[in-house]
Amino acid sequence: MPKTLAEKILSRVAARDAKAGDLVIAPVSRVMVHDSVIDAVMAGLRDLGKEKVWDTTKVAVFVDHAAPAPTPVVADSHRVLREWVRAQGIATFYDAGEGVCHQIMVEEGYCEPGTVIVGSDSHSNSYGAVGAFGAGMGATDIAVALALGRTWLRVPESIKVTFTGRPRKGVTMKDAIMRVVREIGTDGARYACVEFHGAGSLPQGDRITLAGMTTEMGAKAGIVVATPEAPDWLFPDRGAAYANEVTVDLSTLEPQIAVPPRVDQVIDISEAIGQPVDVVFLGSCTNGRLVDMRQAATVLRGRRISPEVRLEVVPSSRRQFEDAMADGTLLALSTAGAVIGSSGCGPCLGRTGGVLAGQEICLSTANRNYRGRMGSADASIFIGSPYVAAVAALTGVIDDPRPYLEASEAEFDDLVERRRSERAGRGAASVRSGDRSRELMVAAARIGVAAEIDD
């Protein structure tokens, strides 16, 4: 019987012929744990009567979600975590400032293609960027995996996503995956494995963006087919059965915007032009890499951000941070007015550094925009690419980055001045009123996305 990638991987690791719907006991090649759930994980191990993890060489621990510690309570939790890591003898430990767990897991080679990796974070799907079956799990399941070195899984059905064509300048794979989320919806891949075809030759960072955002469709895993790291056997069989198939033509795609408060409320940027923003966040496991910062610097180098906007830049790992320092990218962003944060999750989940106030409007390159994600439940979060983020920081409004990337110096300055003037003409009361955000929610509803609009 022809197999999908998920069926192949789980059959191989479980040493049995497995198909979608079967239950398997799967050995794990690595377990990832981070600071947000470590207390519950340690409690789970105690409940299991286990003092030691099954293999200290196959456990990776990170302090990234609330780092550096924002409160004494969190600082105490981090202290306990460090003591536990030392007592266990776990060598693979990344403390505050080293970066986001998912970026480091892939970047440092901890993810082996064709293996099962479980993590205490929903975006552990990111490990599919190199052909691994990465899955996020709760604290109890992670404790069991740490104790036994294996986990149970139901083999998921698979959804095939195929990319064709080449994206135009100013269009990124963040736009591509947002379009996929729009097509599938936040529940359309529930407990499925999303297979990406036509993306294997992409840079590793783009593949992390694709695999990681499958979480936003409800997926159990997301795997890029035919990556450079993949062994010869790691390909889906011809004739494998898929629950759904989606094709995205990159050559006709324009930049995409996710409208709050749902990540699948995605519209073309042409429908969002002029939406004012107060804060721009460039970072996260989705888009905090050197290539993302370089894209932003392409727009911002030699210029200053709008006085109406705060720009927060958080590299996804120390390596990305140092590479961006070495080539002048971070200097360009800092000179433009950005606040540069230490490597980690930053304000993405609203637990440290740069949280949003009530009524503030943010353009984020992260992966989630539900109410309260980055701070106040009364704030609004739009999601876009690094190019879109940079233009928003510069002008104070959401705009299509493509004209800026093609413009002469004089044309560029004219575009910026025009957008800033338009925002100023609206007045502060208009910016805070949310009228434009409401219009965009209605626009999202028109394209068949269920918009949530509160009075």
Question: What does each model-found stretch correspond to?
Answer:
Residues 1-455:
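Fe-S-dependent hydro-lyases/dehydratases of central metabolism
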